[in-house]
A protein has these predicted regions:
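Flexible glycine/proline-enriched surface loops and loop-helix/loop-strand junctions
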Residues: 112, 210, 251-252, 302-305, ...
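N-terminal leader/propeptide and maturation segments of large enzyme subunits in energy/redox metabolism
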Residues: 109-120, 279-315, 494-566, 631, ...
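Acidic/polar loop patches that form or flank catalytic/metal-binding clefts of enzymes
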Residues: 25, 70, 281-282, 318, ...
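Long, contiguous, secondary-structure-rich segments that constitute the structural scaffold
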Residues: 497, 502-551, 624-638, 643-723
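Active-site phosphate/pyrophosphate-binding segments
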Residues: 270, 290-405
Length: 723
């Protein structure tokens, strides 16, 4: 008979063990196991952190009795997490680690690709066969015929970066441009400020005029929201700029709802008003900026009336917004990712990032721009222990943009073509644009597809081999953050269930089977964690492997008053904020509307937004959990009543959403959250949850952004008919 350790623990058993007490937000610890036996039980508590692609990076504690989880709760030692987990993670052990459908043994395909038919095999057989196939491809066509595909499914530096990156660099595989999220935003802010780190999250409480531009913290940055609420209670005004009336927009003092893709024009229009009305901080501009004369000339054509025609806003709205922002102190603009997914994505961030310098907002504590914090960790941690630049830079191989995966898999002119796709920490069948092309590529009989996964995802269904990956409760890791100032260590709470293994161990085994002997391919997880912390940088003062094991997460040792640009100190080539940069084309952020052909305009008149509206998904993670699907309901399309009436569509009608790339079937929901001409579809649902087996990305474009080579997926036009 197999033990629980061999087969995993199903949902009912785990709930019984945990006493059915609440796990996570606001609830006390799950009661520990008790026994009338005289045997002594071993109880331990370890610290960990969320590995998802989220700015919060929550810290948690896991208590076990005899290697069985009895409590999973947020850590109160991290003031940013503040003893609460987000809605997605409160039941993580049941939802992921102990889920009855979790893959716990290697699998080999026995049916057609996409059918989801597999047989169980041993690790020895799986490693032997995959290593042989990879080596054969290398011998015949070179390492570039192999493409690794991963992203933010696990943002741990060990399981997401270290050994996997070293392995693929060692075999000379094609490099993946991981630009699907964040690259355009970063490129834009760097062009203006030279760095993305601005106002720190906790310091938003000192702001008195907060602009949440293209971000929805109540849903996707939940631990920032209490700080925003505190600022509001202290008198701050909350303004949301978003083409969709999000959960956060509904709670704001003012929701400004421009047409999708017009953020650059709006930001330039604000600068026009500020300069025309003399509301700029001329002293700050003279001391710490470059190119204001060119900017003044450039924004002349972005007067309120012209910008109103572009954005769909009233000229009075643009005037009022510009004046209120410029005349409020401290004023803060919070951006994250949202507005990057347009053709002008980087230009939008570039323009918005100029506003704090134009008004001198950086002078004031709580004033400026809040974006990402990852640079703080890049400066302080020993990144070379993770990246081993001498390994990753040799050999220099070609790069393939992850947004263009569908094109790459089907490109007959690509030399060498992609003969092997190795997917981990990602689910590209759902999350990558131009889905039809991606699925067509995954169906190719001569493509070797290997996937490391927890579940039989839509991507895994096309795999030739599936390796069972551990969850964060079962492996070591160290996690920085791109949205907070806390670093976390993740200590395994339990031994790996079944035959699951960490990503790092998978690639160590492959390296050994392929005959490699280089020590950097076999370094242990715990050694990588320790080496990463071996830095004498001031930000890491007082932070050690031992202290992190004790506390879980610690705040970087930053100045009490973090005001990076109060006196300039921009990380640009000049040391100043760049309104104008001759080294970048265009030299000023410019709104360039996407031009659609006349036929496309006529056939696909509606602008599709695919956004994070599901509260309990994290991209496509957790979308296979029954109780979460019950809460979220079936996927739906939000459409303005006037657009619905013009198509004889009533609330609840099943509709077909289509364009030249594909079609999706789902129910219509009449909504005032979108404006006329705009429709909205949630992202994250799996293909099986749609009639027809296609989700939102069957419609999205793989057009690249103006800078950063990100995905302009929101530049998607569609038409809708009632089924």
């Amino acid at each position: 008979m197999k033990s629980k350790r061999d087969r995993g623990i199903d949902r009912r058993e785990f709930i019984e063990i945990s006493g059915k007490a609440g796990i996570g937000i606001g609830l006390s610890a799950v009661p520990l196991l008790t026994s009338s036996c005289t045997e002594v039980s071993t109880t331990k508590t370890v610290h960990g952190a969320c590995y998802h692609d989220c700015p919060d990076r929550c810290s948690w504690k896991v208590t076990t009795v005899d290697d069985e989880v009895t409590a999973f709760q947020a850590s109160e030692d991290n003031p940013y997490t503040a003893g609460k987990l987000c809605d997605k993670m409160v039941d993580f052990p049941n939802d992921v680690t102990f889920h009855p459908d979790r893959i716990l043994t290697p699998l080999k395909r026995v049916g057609d690709k996409g059918q989801g038919a597999f047989e169980k095999i041993s690790w020895e057989q799986a490693i032997r066969e995959v290593a042989f196939k990879l080596q054969s491809i290398i011998d015949q066509k070179g390492g570039e015929a192999i493409l690794p595909y991963s992203f933010g499914g696990n943002q741990g530096m060990v399981q997401g970066d270290a050994i996997p990156n070293r392995f693929f660099a060692h075999i000379g595989a094609s490099q993946l441009e991981r630009t699907i999220c964040g690259s355009a935003a970063v490129a834009g802010v760097l062009a203006t400020n030279g760095q993305t780190t601005g106002v720190l999250p906790e310091d938003i409480v000192h702001s008195r005029y907060i602009v949440l531009w293209g971000t929805n913290p109540m849903l996707s940055n939940q631990h920032l929201w209490p700080f925003i609420q505190k600022a509001k209670n202290q008198g701050a005004k909350i303004v949301v700029v978003d083409p969709f009336k999000s959960l956060t927009a509904s709670e704001a003092d003012w929701h400004i709802q421009p047409n999708p893709g017009t953020d650059t024009a709006l930001a330039l229009g604000l600068m026009h008003v500020i300069l025309a009305e003399g509301l700029q901080d001329q002293d700050y501009i003279d001391r710490y900026t470059l190119g204001v004369d060119q900017l003044k000339e450039h924004v002349q054509k972005f007067d309120p009336e012209s910008v109103a025609r572009i954005t769909g806003l009233e000229p009075e709205t643009i005037l009022e917004f510009a004046k209120a922002y410029a005349q409020s102190t401290p004023s803060l603009i919070r951006v994250l990712i949202g507005m990057e997914h347009q053709a002008n994505g980087a230009s939008a961030f570039r323009a918005v990032a100029m506003l704090p310098a134009l008004t001198g907002a950086w002078r004031h504590f709580g004033g400026g721009l809040m974006h990402m914090t990852y640079e703080l960790f890049g400066a302080s941690l020993d990144w070379e222990s993770i990246s081993l630049p001498q390994v990753l830079a040799n050999p220099q191989t070609r790069s393939i943009n992850m947004i263009e995966l569908g094109k790459a898999l089907n490109d007959e002119a690509l030399n060498p073509g992609i003969d092997a796709l190795f997917v981990f920490n990602s689910n590209p069948a759902v999350t990558t644009p131009n889905q039809s092309a991606v699925l067509r590529g995954l169906q190719k009989k001569d493509l070797l597809t290997v996937v490391s996964e927890h579940f039989l995802t839509d991507t895994a269904r096309y795999a030739d081999y599936i390796f069972p990956a551990t969850t964060v409760l079962e492996n070591w890791d160290i996690l920085d953050s791109w949205g907070s100032t806390y670093i976390n260590i993740n200590e395994p709470a339990i031994a790996p269930l079944g035959a699951s293994k960490p990503n790092s161990e998978l690639f160590r085994l492959l390296a050994g089977e392929m005959g490699f002997t280089e020590s950097y391919l076999f370094e242990s997880d715990i050694d990588i964690v320790k080496k990463t912390l071996q830095s004498d940088h001031e930000y890491l003062k007082g932070i050690t492997f031992e202290s992190l094991r004790e506390s879980g997460g610690q705040r970087l040792n930053l100045p009490e008053k973090w005001m990076p640009h109060a006196e300039g100190n921009f990380k640009t080539t000049s040391g100043k904020c760049h309104f104008y940069d001759a080294g970048i084309q265009p030299s000023l952020p410019t709104y360039i509307p996407v031009t659609y052909g006349k036929k496309d305009q006529e056939e696909y008149p509606l602008h599709l937004l695919t956004i994070k509206t599901p509260r309990y998904f994290l991209n496509s993670s957790h979308a296979n959990v029954d109780h979460i699907l019950e809460k979220e309901g079936k996927p739906y399309l939000e459409i303005h009543p006037s657009d619905a009436a013009a198509r004889n569509i009533a609330d609840g009608h099943e509709v077909k959403v289509f364009n030249q790339r594909g079609s999706v079937y789902l129910a219509a929901r009449l909504s005032q959250k979108v404006t006329r001409g705009v429709v909205c579809m949630p992202q994250g649902y799996w293909l099986s949850q749609f009639r027809g087996g296609s989700s939102a990305n069957a419609l999205t474009t793989d057009l690249l952004t103006d800078m950063g080579r990100g995905g302009a997926i929101q530049e998607t036009k569609v038409e809708i008919t009632k089924v």
